[in-house]
Design a protein with these regions (language model features):
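Beta-strand/loop edge motif enriched in small/polar residues
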Residues: 21-209
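Bacterial N-terminal signal peptides that target proteins for export
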Residues: 1-8
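C-terminal motif of bacterial Sec signal peptides marking the signal peptidase cleavage site
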Residues: 16-19
Length: 209
């Protein structure tokens, strides 16, 4: 019960922050300068994305089961909004292993789309598929992180549909999905905004204290 209470508390903190809009204390503009590296990725990802780097996601990415990805402060993860393949499947971030987003108040992690697409018109456009933690994801930390412009329609060919997480044609991606009832998740000090669907869809799990 203590773990569940902590998880609910963390989720409520996220939703409260998400409602703050432009007055939000977590400002992605803080990590626009001093970038050390730019990398384009798709497929399997693991290891560490170093502080203040820019990660351009050109296709679906997956943290494999048994592996971990750590994202340091100030990293900008920019998703291609054109989608994958003929169906333009929204680019999806699947976490079969573990994910640790370690932003700071001054230098948060950012999951977004290209800056020119961060417009009022695209507020509910669902430009990418969000973070989907599968039933093999044991731990996920999302701290001082901004997640925005998610919620694309689940269509045929999407990893979430292929893995049975969502139904193609009937569902839209939440910004964060968890599936492991034994998983440990902390989502705190973060902003979920400009999403077409739910902010967080939790299927059980425990909080990491």
């Amino acid at each position: 019960m203590k773990f569940n209470a902590l998880l609910v508390s963390a989720a409520m903190m996220v939703m409260t922050l998400a409602a703050c809009g432009d007055d939000d204390p977590v400002n992605p503009d803080n990590n626009q300068g001093g970038n050390e590296d730019t990398e384009t990725v798709e497929g399997d990802v693991e290891g560490t994305w170093k502080a203040n780097s820019i990660i351009l996601v050109s296709g679906h990415i997956t943290v494999p089961a048994g592996k971990s990805l750590t994202i340091e402060e100030g990293v900008q993860v920019i998703f291609d909004d054109k989608g994958v393949g003929a169906n333009h499947v929204p680019v999806e971030f699947t976490v079969d292993g573990n994910l640790y987003c370690k932003g700071t108040a001054e230098n948060p992690v950012l999951f977004s789309v290209a800056e020119e697409n961060r417009t009022k018109e695209n507020t509910f456009a669902g430009l990418w598929g969000g973070i989907v933690a599968s039933n093999s994801c044991e731990e996920m930390l999302i701290d001082h992180t901004v997640i925005e412009y998610t919620g694309g329609q689940v269509v045929e060919g999407s990893p979430a549909a292929a893995n049975g997480v969502y139904t193609a044609g009937d569902d839209a991606y939440p910004q964060i999905t968890t599936n492991n009832i034994k998983g440990k998740y902390v989502i705190t000090n973060s902003v979920l905004r400009n999403g077409w669907s739910d902010g967080i869809y939790l299927m059980g799990g425990q909080a990491v204290s």
